[in-house]
């Protein structure tokens, strides 16, 4: 999975978010909190998902900006995994009265999305699908399996779209082969 490491990715994200948040905080003269979805499942592979990095990044932000203390950092999943994020999302959807499947079918975890062109289109039209074989997709599907819900995202492989049960079976085989 180290092939998916983008050097300094979360620092880049946090720099952009911090600058916007600080601008809003200064304009409104209020405290602004930013949230990041970094989680424990990524600690081993992505150094910028660790608490030590977050602390150092926030300290640098505060040292380098006037009134930076007006921006707070919220990382609720730092000690959790994709399943914890999914459980929280399910709970939030219930509280807000919104359709979980409608929300989550519009999300993407895949590092290898697959574009399938419409056969009738000569203008490049088509649909994007998530792969189900990359590590991030396997972790996502595993979280849905643990939650006991089908993942509403549409999956595909090199042959075309596949039903969720195919993606689920693939992940279950991987988990079984690793004794999980």
Language-model features: locations:
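Nucleotide-activated chemistry modules centered on ATP-dependent adenylation/adenylyltransferase
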Residues: 1-180
